[in-house]
Structures are given as structure tokens and as C-alpha cells.
Amino acid sequence: MVSFRFPFSFSQPPRATTSFSGFSISAVAVSVTVGAAAAGAAIAASRNPSHPILEWAFSSHRSSLSPWGSITLADESVVEPKTGFSFPASIGDSRRLLGVGLRKKSLLGLKNIDVYAFGVYADCDDVKKLVGDKYANLPASEIRGNKSFMDDLMEADIKMTIRLQIVYGKLNIRSVRNAFQESVGNRLKKFGGSDNDELLQSFTSLFKDEYKIPRNSTIDLTKDPGHVLSVAIEGNHVGSVKSHLLCRSILDLYIGEEPFDKNAREDFLDNAASLAFDN
């Protein structure tokens, strides 16, 4: 028999949460897959009263759990509620999912289309060190609302990944390249002034016309140690650019003051702040 605790909270407005073990899950589905020798379990949270969160079958064992539970996070997934697209709760050795969101785009000013769902991952050891070193004396509620905390997360040499999962089936790589040309270009000007055309080109040129991005395909934007931005399409590395400014500009799109999805940003900050108190 196995026991499991998912440690982070994710939101969907309006927020309706079910709390357990010091954390809450709000309007997302968390699925767990175990091997042939173990039983499978699925856990879902919903505002629909006919589908309440399932009882924890192994609640009597929760007190003995480590902070991450006894099932590896690689076996878990979190669903972005508006699209139904799922994201693994962990990627790599120590990057954990701290927020999920949706990128929308206005089409001819008439309607919004869902372009891609995204998940924001961060190396938990790196985040815990940052929080512990600088914010150890503050409660989590104050850390979350501290603007310098957000700035520190984007400025620090923390390994992070933004995983994009394509929702709009008619999207092509040229559209992605043009969209980043605009959005990342604006952030480069915001943080570094106007003379960054060469840096922007070094990033957008990684999105070559030969790459296909059908619905459900993934694009990973990873900030590696040393402020190196690495890009992977469908798990295949396509190039890297070493630039602190570029990394900051990319992260600002998703967790900055004017993000693509405010709920995703709030979830990310909440969960990042909670890491300091997850012993």
C-alpha cells in the first residue's frame, strides 16, 4: 500500500479550495500512476459538488510522509483547468511544478483564442536556499506579497523551466517566432533599453521554419545555471543563448508584474514562498 501527498496549491477563479496537510488544491486534477505491484489512485478537485475531492485512501499514513511523499513526482500530473492539458509535477532531477496557466491572444480584436497552456517549474533546492537565506524570518504570507521576492526569483541563478504546451491547432512556428519577437522584444526594452536587436535575433532565430508544432506539442524554455537560456522543442534541444537580460525578460512574461496569466503567477509565488516552510 502506498501513501501520497501533493505539496503545492493551484488555483482557478473563483477560488474554491479543499485544504489538507497544510496545502490546498483548487480546481485541478492530480493523477498518480504506480507500478504493477501497487494500486493506482486518482485525485481530482472541482467546484462541482457531484465530483468532490476523493477521500485520501491512505490518510492514516500521512504523518510518516516525507515532504514530497512516497511516490515520485514523475508519476504525478497537474491539469490546467481551462484546457484540460496536463503537466508532469516534476521534470529533471529537482524542478517542481509551481504554477500552471494559459496564454490567450486576441484574434482580430473579435475573440480570444487559447494559444498554449504553460507550466512554471523551478529547482526546489535553489528556491529554498534563496528563501532561507533572505526571507527566513518572514511568514509565508509576507514573502508572497513582497515585491523584492519576485525580483529575486527572476534575478537569482535558479534553474527554471517554462513549458509551453500548444493548444491552438493552427499555430505554426513562424507565429511563435513573431509572437516572441514582440513580447520578448518589449521586455528587453523594459529591462535593458533599446539596443538589443542582436540579442533578440539570437533567441528568435532558434525557432526555425522546419520545426512543426501541432496541438499537444511542447516547447521548453529553460534557464540553466549561469543564466543560459536553452530551448527544446518536443524534447529536442534546438539551441541556447547566454544572457542574464534575456532570461529575466522571458521569466517576466510569466511571473512578472504583468504576466500572461495572473493566477499562474500568484500560484507560483505562493508555492515558492511555501517551500521555506516545507520541512
From Swiss-Prot:
Free-text disruption phenotype from the record: No visible phenotype during vegetative growth, but shorter siliques containing a reduced number of viable seeds. Elevated total fatty-acid levels in leaves and seeds of plants grown at 15 and 22 degrees Celsius.
Protein function: Fatty-acid-binding protein. Interacts preferentially with saturated fatty acid. May be involved in alpha-linolenic (C18:3) metabolism.
Tissue expression: Expressed in developing cotyledons, young seedlings, roots, seeds, embryos, macrospores, preanthesis and tapetum. Restricted to developing and reproductive tissues.
Protein name as catalogued: Fatty-acid-binding protein 1
Pfam families: Chalcone_2
Keyword Chloroplast among UniProt keywords: yes
Matching InterPro entries: Chalcone_isomerase, Chalcone_isomerase_3-sand, Chalcone_isomerase_bundle_sf, Chalcone_isomerase_sf, FAP1
Intracellular or extracellular location(s): Plastid, Chloroplast stroma
Binding site for dodecanoate: 103, 116, 183
Family indicated by similarity: Belongs to the chalcone isomerase family.
Single Gene Ontology BP annotation: fatty acid metabolic process
Primary localisation category: plastid
Species lineage: Eukaryota, Viridiplantae, Streptophyta, Embryophyta, Tracheophyta
Keyword Heme: no
GO molecular function: fatty acid binding; intramolecular lyase activity
Any one GO CC term of the record: chloroplast stroma
Record key words, sorted: Chloroplast, Plastid
